[in-house]
Amino acid sequence: MRAYIDPDTIVGVFDATEAEMYIRYTVDIQFTDKIMGGVPQKPDLVAGWIRSKMGVTDDTELASIVRQTLLDLGVETPENATLDEIVAASEKIGLERHGNTFKRDHNGCYIETRQIKSGLKEAVNVLYAGERWGRTKKGPKNAAAEWVFIDGQKMHLGRETPDGTWTQHGVVSGPQGSRSTLTQYDYCEQPSASFTIKSIIDPADGKERITPDQWVKVLTYLQSSGLGALRSQSHGQFKVIGFTRDR
């Protein structure tokens, strides 16, 4: 098995240049209630989830990502297997596991930081739609996609395992009428976490393209919008308890 390398220990030859290109903000958050896991545990659903969330269509690439996702859920699958072989090999796990959960690693449960960036872009779009940012007059959402990054790939929640399971009741309509559904979601109860925003500096004038005041408003919106699954049900809301400009 390949040895794990902690990304924080990797030193790049351009690290000094990167430090000059971005302002960093460390954001400490406290969830006010539950944050819900949104990763399906049944292997045959993982591929569809990845297709919808990541836009992956190539079967070889999809099989690789499905395998890694299952590994993140603690499911061993054959190396270099096809997508069908991975699903077949994981059928027993699929029968034992239901609903949605969090990815996990040696530091416990986490959400991917791409969710945070997506939330920031959504907040920028809501707050500043119609404006034009930068010398090229980009729409704010597109500008944020190019100017803003989140350090690392994971935001850990301080839990080795989820705190419990929530059953969500729903109603779906079909050719035979409406029917009730029950879907289970693993959750973490009031965890605290932190992430770091990298916001680009305009090389023309040395100023931030997104100002500190704008970041305060964006994060204030994100508090109510939330992170994780079932945000439409007000899950995943939090308070920012620390906001530090690191440069």
Segments (PLM) and residue ranges:
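RNA-interacting cores
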Residues: 1-247
